[in-house]
A protein has these predicted regions:
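A residue-level marker of the well-folded mature domains of exported/periplasmic proteins
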Residues: 1-212
Length: 212
């Protein structure tokens, strides 16, 4: 966190936070002291929470509008997998929470929605998430986060598209037609999963940001 203005020699100089809002890597809570360092402090980037809520709502709306075809194996469970970019990044935390809140799979941890990766959750017994439910056309469907992980490569780079492409290969081998939705904290990882598996299997894939 930034120190208070009175304690810093450059306290009156303009400060710009770019792309990443200062926040707790554990909870995703914004560091308001840093964001209000002085009267010329600015943040240039996304509104993490608003965008996250929109992504979650888009996924939920898609399921409801395509309920006749979305459940690929007809088991009454809408299963999704989630590529998490960086477990300590506030945008990634917000986007994971946004998906889980919209689909009813969120559980609380220390007063906030738990954004930890679930690993695998084939039977719905994970404690990081819970089974959600959606009622559409008089029928109730279970919504389950089948798997999620942080996409970090062996060199330590997060938000890694290649890792996401490998992950969807592993998940599809494990879950097959239980996977009805693929979701990602960003477009790069989402496109990697789409090209590696979703496209050929006609599984809707949701990303986030502005890759061309």
């Amino acid at each position: 966190a930034a120190e208070s203005g009175a304690e810093v020699a450059n306290k009156d100089k303009p400060l710009v936070w770019f792309n990443r809002q200062p926040s707790s890597s554990a909870t995703g809570q914004l560091d308001m002291t840093a964001l209000n360092f002085n009267k010329d402090t600015y943040y240039v980037g996304f509104d993490a929470n608003q965008g996250a809520e929109l992504q979650g709502t888009m996924v939920k709306d898609y399921i409801e509008k395509n309920i006749d075809s979305i459940d690929r194996n007809g088991d009454g469970i809408i299963g999704y997998v989630l590529a998490i970019g960086d477990i300590g990044h506030n945008d990634s935390i917000a986007r994971t929470r946004g998906i889980r809140k919209a689909l009813g799979t969120a559980v609380e941890k220390d007063g906030n929605v738990n954004s930890d990766p679930v690993g695998t959750n084939a039977d719905g017994t994970a404690t990081v998430v819970q089974d959600g439910s959606l009622e559409v056309g008089g029928k109730t469907y279970v919504v389950r986060e089948l798997a999620s992980q942080e996409m970090k490569n062996s060199a330590g780079a997060t938000w890694d598209a290649a890792t996401a492409g490998n992950a969807i290969g592993t998940w599809s081998s494990s879950f097959g037609d239980q996977i009805d939705i693929v979701a990602s904290n960003n477009d790069g990882m989402g496109m990697s999963m789409f090209n590696a598996w979703s496209k050929d299997n006609k599984v809707p894939t949701f990303g986030y940001d502005a890759n061309s």
